[in-house]
Structures are given as C-alpha cells and as structure tokens.
Amino acid sequence: YGIEVLPLYRDLAIPGAAKELYDTCQEKNIPIEVLVNNAGMFFFCETLQAKANIVEKMLYLHVTTPTQLCYYFGQEMKKRRHGYILNMSSLSCWLPYPGITLYASTKRYLKSFSRGLRSELLDYGVSVTVLCPGAVATNLYNLSDNLKTLAIRLGIMMRPEKLAKKGINALFHHRASLLPGL
C-alpha cells in the first residue's frame, strides 16, 4: 500500500497518555488522517464493589483519553479540512445494565460525545463515526477459544476482523453511527 507504519506503544489508561501520544506524533511529523479510539477494558461487577484503581483506569481508557485524542488530533484535522475519527462504543450504551453499569455509562458517553463532535466538525471535512457493536470475540471477556468459537457460530459474538471491516466501511462512507449485527 506504500504506507509506512510506526508503532507507538502507550498505556492509554493513565493521565497524560493522549498528550504524550500527540506530542510524539508532532515531533516525528506524523500527520494523523484516521484516528481510531478502540482501546478498552471490561469487568463484570457492581460499580461500588470495583477497586478504585480499576474504575479510574476504565474512565481514562473509555472517556478521558479518547476525548483528549479527539481534541488534539481533531484540531489538526480541522485545520487540514480533512480527517476521520472512529470511536468504539458498545451496544450496551443504549440501556443500563446492572453489573456493567460503569462500562455501559462510559460507552454511552462515547456515543453522545461522538455524535456532538460529528456535528461540530462536519463543515470542516472531518467525519466522526461511532461504532456500537455487541459482543466481539476478543480477549476482553476472558473466554476460552472454544467458547468464543461457539458464540460466533450461534451469532452471539462477532469476529473482530468482520467488525473492523464494517467499522472502516462505515467511517469512509461518512456514517454517523453503526450498530453491526442489528
């Protein structure tokens, strides 16, 4: 494809991660044309029973860091009058789910934030899409490969490759949102 790839490893669940990543891209003169906010974590327990450091990590990973990445890289895209932002929400963003209240709430934020940001950037040639999938067969749920395979066959989970294709297709077709599988 004639594209040079430079991997940059960062823990996005800590304060300052977004600014550090942005500064690195600026120093290396790497213009970001497509921003995909897909880092995530999941745990099943009532919010008040969760460990404080895990709650904080989830808030950074799902709310603070994606917002800041959109802020920093979105400004560059707005100046260039071109760019794409894909934010990963979840089907859980539509309803409150006991046991995953914090997770669902952070995903609801990403959906709402993405829709508003889309309106703010549309006149500047920057497309923002929010992806709201159901369960995806990744290591997020700590399931065995056999269980993931069964869940895919039963239509309960989606293969990550299939989701990625659907998400990128929606992004490049300037869709506001996509609920794959529905």
Locate the predicted segments by residue.
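Conserved NAD(P)H cofactor-binding loop of Rossmann-fold oxidoreductase domains
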Residues: 38-43
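Active-site loop immediately N-terminal to the catalytic Tyr-X3-Lys motif
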Residues: 48, 97-101
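Substrate-binding pocket helix/loop in short-chain dehydrogenase/reductase
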Residues: 46-59
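Active-site helix of classical SDR
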Residues: 70, 106
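The beta1-alpha1 cofactor-binding region of Rossmann-like NAD(H)/NADP(H)-dependent oxidoreductases
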Residues: 9-20, 52
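Residue(s) in the substrate-gating loop at a strand-loop-helix junction
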Residues: 90
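SDR active-site lid
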Residues: 118-182
